[in-house]
Amino acid sequence: MRPTHAQPPLLRVNVLLFLLLTCAAGVWAQSKPIEPCEPAAAPTPAAPKCPDKAATRASKTLIDDNIPADPEVEKLLAPYSSKVHELSVVIGTLSGQLKRSLVGSGSMGNFVADALKSQATKKNKSIVVAITNGGGMRKISIEPGPLHTSDIFELLPFENALITVDLTGAQLLKLLENVTRAHDAQSGARIQFRWNAQDRPEFIRAKLIDSAGHESEIDPAGTYTIVTIDYLYKLNSGNYALLRDGKNMTPLNLTLRDAVIDHVKSETAAGRPIRAQTDDRFQQIGPGPSRPIEIR
């Protein structure tokens, strides 16, 4: 008879072998790549069912003065109707064509800048120069004849407010140089310029000019008050960045458009027509540009 103590080692071997095979199977299962499941096909939408026949009915109604007014609609339009009526009011008579052109924005620029200076000076007597940008004038020309409020709204559609700024004479000269280069408008100075080889206006010199036409030198160390629009002041870049270097910026609580309208009404009340000024506030020295230049 075999001794009974030899059986346990054989049993342990079998158990260990079973455990090893089980672990190997688990490792093989983990290393096997998982096949992706095929997505289920989307159901085909059912075709919409349309009726075999469709019936439509149309009617025609003539809209003319025989249709009674709707009180609710009239109430809704009333505030706007009064504004439209204001736009159609004749505020003056234009004696010649106003037109934008190159340097200084032409007679249109002179008209706007002169009106700006005229009305702003009523609020601040120390103003010597008015400046505004030609790009803010949205009409190329206005023909002679009755001048309506709507003409000014079309010309100046933006809510640009007037401000005054104190500049040194050196800053003012630099500003007038930038005005010349940008084809913008000014009132209160006489500027000499030439056309350079790139067909761009090049500033030479400038002097102040009063309402009687008398010239005076600009002292680089002096202090001068100008009026312009808040849009140019807020730009803080390009031709008008130096406005931020000025002192005592003061709002005048008046928009450019209202200043022009008030100027026209004031001239009309005084019995004077609105003239298209083409004076020598911009004096060209030498020949003009070598090619046609588009006005934008």
Stretch-by-stretch model annotation:
Residues S31-A69, G106, N110-R296:
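Feature captures C-terminal
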Residues E74-K75:
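Polar, low-complexity export/assembly segments characteristic of proteins
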Residues R2-L16:
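Bacterial N-terminal signal peptides that target proteins for export
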